[in-house]
């Protein structure tokens, strides 16, 4: 028989439930069961002697009511091994001062063994303290059912609040992850855009350099053409001046004899 994980909550001896059992009473001892050795979840009291005196009707009814309340607060643990169903009910034995001291020692020891963090969010620490609180509720419920039920409401409220905070935390983490992915995607897009703009800039610079080279070639060609034209025009002017001087000399030579 392999018991479930050890817990700080005090349980009775695990019992083997018959395979043909369809309905279980509030306490597993009322079934056709075979008691086994206790687990290491904590000190387990010795079972009451079979030949002992029976409880008065009022006490028996009160004990049954306490058992039902305990089962509603802390449901029995069930597991299957080799096709057999095992059930372990939470203990209804009142706690002594030694049990409380032992609970504290067990809590400290398991916190150290499982290396629970002392601060911050720690699932291990939360689990162990939840088990400790459940054991305290069990102890209080046996002494006063009303006080135990009130503590149950406190426990459920705390769990609901923690669950709400956990949901909020998970949604915040998911939101942060989405934003991080969006930022990463935006970063990739911006890097690609920067690369494209860099290539476009280099292409434009190449075109500018080509146009500058063309402009310089055109300016050089036009300067050379202008020099050729200026030289040609200067030669034409000199030719026209010489021609004009020759014509003037000829004209003067023609006019001078006529005056005589």
Swiss-Prot record:
InterPro entries: Axonemal_dynein_light_chain. One of its GO terms (cellular component) is dynein complex. Keywords: Coiled coil, Dynein, Motor protein. GO terms for molecular function: dynein heavy chain binding. Residues 177-260 form a coiled coil. May undergo some post-translational modifications that shift its mobility on SDS gels. Residues 1-66 are annotated as: Disordered. May play a dynamic role in flagellar motility. Belongs to the inner dynein arm light chain family. This is 33 kDa inner dynein arm light chain, axonemal. It comes from Strongylocentrotus purpuratus (Purple sea urchin).
């Amino acid at each position: 028989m392999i018991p479930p994980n050890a817990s700080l909550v005090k349980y009775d001896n695990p019992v083997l439930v018959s395979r043909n059992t369809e309905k279980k009473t509030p306490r597993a001892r009322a079934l056709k069961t075979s008691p086994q050795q206790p687990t290491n979840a904590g000190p387990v009291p010795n079972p009451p002697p079979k030949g002992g005196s029976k409880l008065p009707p009022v006490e028996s009814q009160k004990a049954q009511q306490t058992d039902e309340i305990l089962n509603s607060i802390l449901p029995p643990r069930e597991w299957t091994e080799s096709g057999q169903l095992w059930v372990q009910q939470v203990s209804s034995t009142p706690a002594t001062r030694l049990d409380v001291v032992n609970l504290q020692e067990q809590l400290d020891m398991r916190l150290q063994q499982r290396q629970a963090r002392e601060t911050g969010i720690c699932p291990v620490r939360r689990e162990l303290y939840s088990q400790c609180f459940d054991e305290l509720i069990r102890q209080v419920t046996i002494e006063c059912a009303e006080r135990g039920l009130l503590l149950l409401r406190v426990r459920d409220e705390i769990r609901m609040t923690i669950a709400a905070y956990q949901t909020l935390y998970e949604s915040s983490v998911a939101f942060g992850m989405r934003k991080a992915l969006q930022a990463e995607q935006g970063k990739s897009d911006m890097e690609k855009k920067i690369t494209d703009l860099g290539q476009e800039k280099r292409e434009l610079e190449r075109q500018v350099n080509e146009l500058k080279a063309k402009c310089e070639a055109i300016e050089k060609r036009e300067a050379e053409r202008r020099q050729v034209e200026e030289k040609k025009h200067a030669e034409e002017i000199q030719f026209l001046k010489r021609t004009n001087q020759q014509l003037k000399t000829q004209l003067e030579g023609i006019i001078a004899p006529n005056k005589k």
